[in-house]
Amino acid sequence: GSIVGGGLKDLRIASIKAVDEAGVSGYRLSGIPSNLDDQEFSRIINEITPKLEEEKLRYLPAALSFDQMIGAVLAGVDLIDSNLAAKKAANGIALVNQGATVLHLDRQHFNFDSQVLDRQCACATCRAGYSRALLHSLITNHSFYGEQLLLQHNLFTLNKLMGGLRQAIKNHQTKKFVQELLQNQ
């Protein structure tokens, strides 16, 4: 069932109660405004999740930033549907260092940069050796191919990040994982 109420705590609590009474098998955390800053998003998510039954699936249909994705997982969200990788790629931005750092490939200083996006990355874009300079050229010339290469890289990066976070949670190393991630920002 859908949890609604936006930033209004009383409405969200009433919504949670109604969903629980309906006996559904999971929660859809909807009604969270898309224009929230990370701090307000975190406040709302951290108010909602402790009130949800633990054995039920928790689905977030939209996380718009890197920090929101991490915060949602740490708050107990099980499934996130995010367009972060695509939005960044469409704007010429590559996610590197497990997504903690961004490269704005439309900027001129990438014009002659022969490095791949991320030497530590095993995505098809990086393995094929596409340089930052080539990607810069494709992006600044509005090539759809450049956006596709960035999307492929960004999806791989975020999937690897979530896999690492999942493993850290499983091994009770979440705090250490997040600290290392934040040091890379």
Question: Which residues does each PLM region occupy?
Answer:
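Glycine-rich phosphate/ribose-binding loops and adjacent secondary-structure elements
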Residues: 1-118
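C-terminal extensions of enzymes
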Residues: 118-185
